[in-house]
């Protein structure tokens, strides 16, 4: 089993946090200490303890060892992904230091991205440049909706073009009323050059549900 995994998505709001939580649960059930890391988190809210992001809080709660919030999310940003990531100075070295600290504490670190694969940072570099720098193998979350086949194939190709291994992909049913759901999954299986690691059904409040049962990590457990 690899010690560091990066979770990206075909778009924003496709279920990266839900799948990251499922991965953390599955790894913990297999006897590994697994922690979540979301270096950059947008749409954070002001609280009595400072800025907090809901996705990062879910990763913190789902980690198998106790972590403080700053370890999970060193950059909690207000606003949407476009403005937050371009208006705030993001230090890639700080992101790397956080990853190294968590790697020293846990068997596996699940790193969750921000938005999709090609998100621009404030210095005109892509977030994916940092992923390439750290040589993180990637798991792709495909939010099953109209247009997702195109988004998935383009994202997968971009990851491969950046020289990183695409370990696998996970389908997340974000639209319970989508027609031709089974056909969409079948086409993704045929077209994506990586194994399917799981399929999450549409679930109300998935952050409160056991999710490991929807994954099969056999393909990346060697």
From Swiss-Prot:
The active site is at residue 38. ATP binds at residues 55, 112-115, 172-173, 201-203, 208. Substrate binds at residue 42. Its main location: cytoplasm. It is found in: Cytoplasm. Pathway: Cofactor biosynthesis; biotin biosynthesis; biotin from 7,8-diaminononanoate: step 1/2. Its EC number is 6.3.3.3. Its cofactor is Mg(2+). GO terms for cellular component: cytosol. Mg(2+) binds at residues 17, 55, 112. It comes from the Bacteria. One of its GO terms (molecular function) is ATP binding. Keywords: ATP-binding, Biotin biosynthesis, Cytoplasm, Ligase, Magnesium, Metal-binding, Nucleotide-binding. The keyword ATP-binding applies. GO terms for biological process: biotin biosynthetic process. SUPFAM superfamilies: P-loop containing nucleoside triphosphate hydrolases (SSF52540). It catalyses: (7R,8S)-7,8-diammoniononanoate + CO2 + ATP = (4R,5S)-dethiobiotin + ADP + phosphate + 3 H(+). InterPro entries: DTB_synth_BioD, P-loop_NTPase. The keyword Metal-binding applies. Catalyzes a mechanistically unusual reaction, the ATP-dependent insertion of CO2 between the N7 and N8 nitrogen atoms of 7,8-diaminopelargonic acid (DAPA, also called 7,8-diammoniononanoate) to form a ureido ring. Homodimer. Belongs to the dethiobiotin synthetase family. This is ATP-dependent dethiobiotin synthetase BioD 2. It comes from Yersinia pestis. The gene is bioD2.
